[in-house]
Amino acid sequence: MLSLIIPAKELDECLFETIYNYTLTFNHDYEIIIVYDFTDKKVYEKFNNNFNNNKKIILLLSPIKGRINALNYGYTQSKGDIIKCIDADDTLLSSYFDELEIMDNYSAHCHNASLIDGNNKVIGTYTFEKNILFKDYQYVLSNLKSPPRWVWSFNREIAECIFPIPPELFAEDVWFSLIIKKNCNKIFHLNSEVYLYKQHDGGEWGGVKNFSAEVMSLRARWNLKLIPVLLKNKISLGIVSDDIFSNIISYYKVLLNKKSISNIILSKTTIYYKAKLFLIMYSPSLATLLISIKWLVSKQLIAIKKS
C-alpha cells in the first residue's frame, strides 16, 4: 500500500478538489494522510462530510504547527509499505501508479514533473538530476543536491532512516535527498512527468526557474542555515569532516553579497561554482533558459544510459 502524506497549512477548496479527484482516479491500494495546521469550520465540514466514510482519506490536525512537524506526525500515522510526501497545491497523476510495482525491486523511486502556473497550465518540465542517480554519495553530500521531496517514494526501511526529520531544518528537501542517496543501493528513476508541480512567483523559494538576485540571496541565506543542522547529524549523514561543505558555503556567501566580479574571482570555491555565480548574477535570464535545456538534455541522457 502507498501512504501519501500531504502537509497543509490549512484545508481549502483547492485541496478538497484535488483529494476528490484522487478518489476518482486512484484505483490502487493507497491511503492519503492530510496533516493540517488549521482550517475554516465550513471547509472542514465539507471534507468531513465527503470523506468521513472513506477509510483511505485521513484528516489529522497537527499537534505542532509547521511543515516538518506535519510530515513527522503524518509518518507516525501511516501504514503503507511505500511512503510518498507531496505538496498540497500540487497533483500526483494516476500514471504514477503504473510503475509502482517496480518498487519491490528498489528501496527508492523518483520521477520527473510538469511545471504548471496558477491556472494549471503546463509551462515547462522538470527532470530529476541525473548526477544524483549516477554519482556517489560524497558528491551529492558536498554539493547539497536536493530535488524537491515530492520526487521521492521509498519503502519503510528507508523511511525509518528519514523520520523523524530534524524539526530545526528550514527545509526538508536536502534531508530526503541525502538520507535516500546514502542508504539506497539502487534508485529507480521513472523518466516521465507523473506530477504537476505548481509554480508560485511569490512562493517560499520563488519558483524553480527563478534566478533573480532577490530570490537567490534568500535561497543562499536559508541554505546556509541548513548546514549547522546537518553537521549536528553527522552520524546519520556519514559526515567525516566539516570541510565537506566549504565550496558550497563559499558559493552561498557570494550570493549574499552585492554583485561583484572580484568577489566571484576571489571566492574560495571551485571553478564550476564561480562560473555558476557569473551566470546567475550577471545573466539570470540566461540561467533560466539553460536550466530548461539542461532538464531536456538530462531526460535524454538518462534514457540513453538506462537503455
Q: In which residue ranges do the predicted regions lie?
A:
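Short, well-formed alpha-helical segments that are part of the catalytic scaffolds
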Residues: 10-24
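Glycine-rich, basic loop-to-helix element that forms the pyrophosphate-binding segment
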Residues: 62-78
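Conserved nucleotide-sugar donor-binding catalytic segment
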Residues: 135-210
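C-terminal subregions of glycosyltransferases and related glycan-biosynthesis enzymes
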Residues: 24, 169, 182, 198-307
